[in-house]
């Protein structure tokens, strides 16, 4: 991942930085927290070891940003590159979560700014993600930052037991 200066907000004790291997346990906990919020508490099968290998091994396939305060990870954004035959290189925001007790403090905005900066630095043509139609707080956040939300495309998926 390209070097990113730690982004500290004036007067805040928390800051956003690139994720590290040692953050994976806390990131996993946030992934589970998000799954519970999204009404899929048993859907997470990825392990801390998977995150460590897939994000920090010799063939890392994702980039990670974390929000930290006093050594505790309180938010995260996980992204990876994808390719659009219409647009070319894109960045996909897979998970974006701030722990429930810390929402509304600007942490999400700072995490999203880090993701946006990464997208710009890589020269991608689009940053995209999904949001559940009932997740009104997230939809409001995305609309506030000027994102285009598409209600027309349906998601397809086939799951494999590995």
Where are the predicted features?
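Conserved GNAT-fold acetyl-CoA-binding loop/helix
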Residues: 28-53
